[in-house]
Amino acid sequence: MTARIGVVTFPGSLDDRDTQRAIRVAGAEPVALWHKDKDLKQVDAVVLCGGFSYGDYLRAGAIARFSPVMDTVIDQAKAGLPVLGICNGFQILTEAHLLPGGMLGNDHLHFICRDQKLRVENADTSWTSDYTAGQEIHIPLKNMDGRYVADRRTLDELEAEGRVAFRYLDMNPNGSLNDIAGITNAAGNVVGLMPHPEHAVESLIGTGRTDGLPFFTSILKKLVNA
């Protein structure tokens, strides 16, 4: 039976179709979920994609966190449902307190769009198991509010528990503390990151790299072997 991965679309989402395409390339079935849906249609995992949900009013992800679909996502994530938040999706996960910390505007106050070098720090999550710890990858990055922040106690816990999933290499593009590009929850089923793996899954388009594909093959293998 084909694994079914839901992709949530909020008003202002930009990368839902790209994410659905990445899921197909990996061999799973994408399932479109609307922000007003309360039923997740029996999906096996959920992706919150990038964009500017609700125009980023109040704060990036702050309004989307209260969409009807998020009530169900939060409940099921706490029960073990794999959830991936990409860019705006990462912001939403922090607003929903499924991941600690928060996101602020880039320290240089400019929108950035670049291919970003990352190091995989944790390859033991639902979404990263097809990588190896220490692996260096290149993933497209595009954001205005990508600066990850947290208090010192939270940062120390993330580092001590191995919950930093990805770290920026060569340069810190937005001022994120500890060069953090992505993190995971303690259980490893919820992962959020600012770069866009869905834009790096096919060699014929974009950068020509497929460094983002393991996100989607990782979750597929986990679901198939569950």
Swiss-Prot record:
Part of the FGAM synthase complex composed of 1 PurL, 1 PurQ and 2 PurS subunits. It comes from the Bacteria. This is Phosphoribosylformylglycinamidine synthase subunit PurQ. Residues 4-226 form the Glutamine amidotransferase type-1 domain. It is found in: Cytoplasm. It comes from Streptomyces coelicolor (strain ATCC BAA-471 / A3(2) / M145). SUPFAM superfamilies: Class I glutamine amidotransferase-like. GO terms for biological process: 'de novo' IMP biosynthetic process. It catalyses: N(2)-formyl-N(1)-(5-phospho-beta-D-ribosyl)glycinamide + L-glutamine + ATP + H2O = 2-formamido-N(1)-(5-O-phospho-beta-D-ribosyl)acetamidine + L-glutamate + ADP + phosphate + H(+); L-glutamine + H2O = L-glutamate + NH4(+). Pathway: Purine metabolism; IMP biosynthesis via de novo pathway; 5-amino-1-(5-phospho-D-ribosyl)imidazole from N(2)-formyl-N(1)-(5-phospho-D-ribosyl)glycinamide: step 1/2. Disulfide bonds: none annotated. PANTHER family: PHOSPHORIBOSYLFORMYLGLYCINAMIDINE SYNTHASE SUBUNIT PURQ. Part of the phosphoribosylformylglycinamidine synthase complex involved in the purines biosynthetic pathway. Catalyzes the ATP-dependent conversion of formylglycinamide ribonucleotide (FGAR) and glutamine to yield formylglycinamidine ribonucleotide (FGAM) and glutamate. The FGAM synthase complex is composed of three subunits. PurQ produces an ammonia molecule by converting glutamine to glutamate. PurL transfers the ammonia molecule to FGAR to form FGAM in an ATP-dependent manner. The keyword Transcription does not apply. GO terms for cellular component: cytoplasm. It holds the Pfam family GATase_5. The active site is at 87 (nucleophile), 196, 198. The keyword Nucleotide-binding applies. Keywords: ATP-binding, Cytoplasm, Glutamine amidotransferase, Hydrolase, Ligase, Nucleotide-binding, Purine biosynthesis. GO terms for molecular function: ATP binding; glutaminase activity; phosphoribosylformylglycinamidine synthase activity. Its EC number is 6.3.5.3, 3.5.1.2.
